[in-house]
């Protein structure tokens, strides 16, 4: 009887293990990984992240070293290395395709003590959702939210900073984080 129970348990364990690793489950995991952009930065310059409001935003002399989606190591000082938007304007980033993400990273200008009054929105097919609202944000931050399909991220400069009118971004990223 004990031997039969052992055999039954082993057969049951084998069937459960086989069912877990079925081709359907593996295919679903592969598709989900692709939809999540392989957990890479969807706003990366090389991934095709576009600043759609580039004509209305401000850059210092060299465009490439000032765009916040750049992949290279960057130097930031009072002359270059950042992008900013005026009061009541937005920095809008659009991707080549939609991705499922749950984390947005941004680095704000913080070489002088200042806090920013801004909002962050994500959208998919024109439906926008507020994911961050702050009257006193500073430095670099990760914004976590529920898994969602996203094709556009908008940083709205609601009130500028305590130092001036601008929302100054040094770096932006968006990705799926487990």
Predicted features along the sequence, with ranges:
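Classical eukaryotic N-terminal signal peptides for Sec-dependent ER targeting/secretion
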Residues: 1-9
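Disordered, acidic Ser/Thr/Pro-rich linker "stalks" and the adjacent N-terminal cap
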Residues: 3, 14-96, 109-114, 177-178
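Intrinsically disordered, low-complexity repeat segments enriched in small/polar residues
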Residues: 8, 55-56, 155, 160
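Trp- and acidic/polar-enriched beta-sheet ligand-binding modules for extracellular glycan
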Residues: 22-37, 44, 85-88, 110-178
């Amino acid at each position: 009887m004990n031997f039969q129970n052992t055999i039954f348990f082993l057969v049951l364990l084998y069937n459960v293990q086989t069912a877990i690793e079925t081709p359907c489950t593996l295919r679903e995991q592969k598709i989900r990984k692709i939809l999540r952009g392989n957990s890479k930065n969807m706003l990366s310059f090389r991934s095709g992240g576009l600043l759609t409001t580039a004509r209305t935003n401000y850059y210092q002399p060299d465009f490439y070293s000032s765009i916040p989606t750049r992949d290279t190591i960057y130097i930031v000082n009072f002359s270059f290395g950042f992008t900013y938007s005026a009061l009541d304007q937005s920095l809008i980033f659009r991707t080549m395709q939609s991705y499922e993400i749950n984390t947005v990273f941004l680095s704000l200008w913080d070489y002088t003590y200042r806090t920013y009054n801004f909002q962050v929105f994500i959208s998919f097919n024109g439906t926008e959702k507020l994911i961050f609202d702050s009257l006193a944000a500073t430095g670099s931050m990760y914004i976590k939210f529920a898994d969602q399909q996203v094709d556009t991220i908008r940083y709205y400069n609601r009130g500028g900073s305590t130092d001036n009118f601008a929302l100054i971004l040094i770096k932006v990223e968006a990705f799926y984080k487990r």
